[in-house]
Amino acid sequence: MKPKDPFATSGLPPINQPEQENNRALEDVREIDSKYLILVADDSADSAAMISLYLQHQGYRVLTAANGEDAIKIASSTFPNLILMDISMPTLDGLGATRRIREDETLRDIPIIAVTAFGTEGFQRAAYDVGVSGYLTKPIDLDRMCNLIAHLLSPTGSGSLPS
């Protein structure tokens, strides 16, 4: 006959239950996030790769474009949930691409985050004037980027930051 374990807690959840719940919650968040497709438009292959890998690690699906023209073409065929748009790109820069996306009936509501090395107030104003939903300066603070993305994709985010 096996002796009764004095530390057994019959009917009680295991001690590691909170950790299991946290892991389950994290899996739920990643499952929810994975339905979101983010387009990263950046002519720097290194920047695009770094941002893409980080977003994929966070559970997002990611596509990339090397210039504004490609970003518009990809957005038109895939309808991403959000676009991270570098401002200084060849062929068509991020401001021009954002302007054209905002003029397109089928794309205009996609949140666009401007990503640039230019942090001046005038440059930021120009980006908001063409319709960006958020603004990040390089080097990118990845936590801030993820918080901004989460806000813009949330039901209350409505594609723009609160004033």
What is the role of each PLM region?
Residues 1-37, 143-163:
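Non-catalytic signal-transmission and effector/linker regions of two-component phosphorelay proteins
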Residues 49-57:
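Charged docking surfaces used in two-component/phosphorelay signaling
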Residues 59-66, 74, 136:
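Short hydrophobic/Thr-rich beta-strand motif most characteristic of the beta2 strand and flanking loop
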Residues 78-84:
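Active-site beta3 strand of CheY-like receiver
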Residues 89:
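Receiver (REC) domain active-site loop signature in two-component systems and cognate sites
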Residues 133:
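Short, glycine/charged-rich "phosphate-handling" switch motifs in NTP-dependent
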